[in-house]
Curated annotation (Swiss-Prot):
Location of the protein in the cell: Secreted
Higher taxonomy: Eukaryota, Metazoa, Chordata, Craniata, Vertebrata
Residues bearing glycans: N131, N143
Native organism: Gorilla gorilla gorilla
Record protein name field: Inactive ribonuclease-like protein 9
Function comment: Does not exhibit any ribonuclease activity.
Amino acid sequence: MMRTLITIHPLPLLLLLQQLLQPVQFQEVDTDFDFPEEDKKEEFEEYSEQFFSIGPTRPPTKEKVKRRVLIEPGMPLNHIEYCNHEIMGKNVYYKHRCVAEHYFLLMQYDELQKICYNRFVPCKNGIRKCNRSKGLVEGVYCNLTEAFEIPACKYESLYRKGYVLITCSWQNEMQKLIPHTINDLVEPPEHRSFLSEDGVFVIPP
């Protein structure tokens, strides 16, 4: 019977045999995997890097700062659950651990970037030089209160309206200074008298 089929229909059988023996990588495979859209590519790469990288993290980019730090009007900034909601929604963490503190700022990126060209002032946590905003900015300070690993992180949310202190770094691709970290959001009533003789804003240790 098999000999008869081979004799009568040699070509179709050869094609079928070739298909069966063809390496898997050359066959068409239908999958349900969804690859990241173009506007999600950086976020996907950042997620992979945080969990699988063993080297130093990449410096922050414009899109990362916009996504993780800058906020739009919506939930009231004085809401008790603001930080818990936003930190989880914006995936603010380092590898699989909670961040000890974080700031959300109600401002545009261009306004934040301009601060990089303001005068230097002292800042907290042993950092010698920060750039300070000229005007007051609304934001939320998030302070870790419970747990150390995601997703159990719990934060205290503190509304602030004050001067933003940031550090900046030079980005070769853009040939510009860009915001690197938010060091503090200093409310003026508490530090109103801390001005040096030349008008430089000074924060006590």
